[in-house]
Structure formats: structure tokens, C-alpha cells
Amino acid sequence: MGILNNIFGKKNEKPENKGQHILSMPMFKGDRGYSLDKVIQDLKSYWGLKVDEIEGDDNTATFKIDEELVALALMPAPIPSAEFESIYNYSYLWKDAEKEIQEHTQHAIVSLLGLGSNTSAVERYSLLSKLNASILRTCETAIGIYQGASTLLLPKNLYIDFTDLLLDEDDILPIQLWVYIGIINSDEKSSVYTYGMKEFGKSEIEIIDANMKGSELYDFLLPVLDYVLQQDVTLQHGETIGFTEEQKIKITESKAVFLDGNSLKLEL
């Protein structure tokens, strides 16, 4: 990433979304939800986290992890189906999403309340992912996660596998759990766009009508997003990026094609 460090723009000059309330919704099939005791034990043993000030039970609970106040609440009803109708067709990471999600019977709300927290959005989403993974790993009836802010539907085993990237501080981030990457294929050209970078105080990114396969664009964009979030970089209109000294990809800010508002375009 040395080349990226030289060619990408400046360190973040805009205030990041610190201390905001973020949440996710694990989904369950059957009569049982998570066990608070098992979740706490997994957070300690698997992730090595210090969990303090635990109050509540399997229905509602709060506790602290470092500076973060965490709240868990089990809701004895499924998430309304209307919430998912517009995103099933785009949920390519969950093969049978519609069928399996329609069978869920209850869900939980996992919240980081952000009260007094000064940790970065990446640190907070990392913690949220660890919480979700601990719930999924310790609960046989859990089927997956709904990350509403990014319109992501994520199946259980995939979620657990991607979260394991957080065990190694030098590894890449589990971007797929935080940011939706839309892939548009048409004739011989493809486009990709992000939805969820705003959660980290960053601009959404689009690559429009590139002479590449959608899968190739996806593979190109992932390390860019990882670098932007890991290094807290703000891409600027008029700059260039590249993975080699010779590669200079122009960055342009303009009205988004697949999103509301503006986006940054990488011109391949």
C-alpha cells in the first residue's frame, strides 16, 4: 500500500462520524434467541474483550466494552417483510436470502449507543461485527444479520468468516459486512457503486461503464475502500489514485448515477 499512500490524497480533513448510534439486527428461526451469558463469554474468550457493568437478561441487557455502552434487546417478532422487499434481488452474498429470511420468527437489536465514545467509526463497526459474530456463533437458531444502514443482508456462516479478519490487526477489514457494493453489468461494460461509506464520514464511490467485468471491478474497489477506511483517507475531486507509480486514475465528484446526491467517480 506504499504506492497508495503516496498517490492518495490527504488524511481526513472532515470530522468523522464518532459517537453516533449504530445498530444491527440478528435474525433467528425458532422459539429461542441468544443467551446473554454465552454471548458475553464468547466476547471474552474468542475476541479477548473486557466486558463490564453487565445488567439485564436474555431479553434486554446493557454492558460496557472499553468506552462503548452496548445494548441488546430481543424482539419476539420478525422484522416486517416490507423492510426487505426492495433489497432481496441485490443481496448476492446470501444465496437463498428471501426464502430463509421469510422463515425467521424473531430478531434482536444490537446497539452501540455512542455515549461519551470517542473511538473511530472503523473501531465501532469492528466492535459491532464482533458482537454480531458472538451472537451468531453461540446461537443455533441464528440465521444472519440485517445491516439496515447499508441495506445488507448477510448469512450466518459468511458473517462469522468475514469477521475473523478482525483477529489480525494487519489483515484487511471486513468491508463486505459494512458497505454494500452494487454491481451493474450491461453488454461489455460494467459499473460498481458503494452504499454505506457515509457511515464512516466518507463519500460514496462509483465506477461507471468500465471495460471490465463486474467481478473485476469489485476486486479492484475492495482494496481502495479498505485503504480509505484503514488509513482514514479522504479522496478529493481532481486528485488521482493508483496501485503503481504509473497508474493514475482520476477522481471526479459529480451527481451520482446509482445513488442520491453526489459521489466520487473513479475513471477507469
What are these regions (language model features)?
Residues 27, 31, 116-124, 209-213:
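Conserved aromatic-histidine-acidic binding/catalytic patches
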Residues 29-100:
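N-terminal low-complexity, intrinsically disordered segments
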Residues 35, 120-131, 213-220:
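Short amphipathic alpha-helical segments
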Residues 77-172:
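Internal, hydrophobic cores of structured domains that mediate oligomerization or house catalytic pockets
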Residues 150-240, 245-268:
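Aromatic/basic-lined ligand-recognition segments
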Residues 45-52, 130-145, 227-235:
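Structural alpha-beta junctions
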Residues 2-55, 257, 261-268:
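Short, extreme N-terminal segment that most often corresponds to the first beta-strand
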Residues 32-37, 116-120, 153-154, 250, ...:
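Short, surface-exposed beta-strand/loop "edge" segments at domain boundaries and coil↔beta transitions
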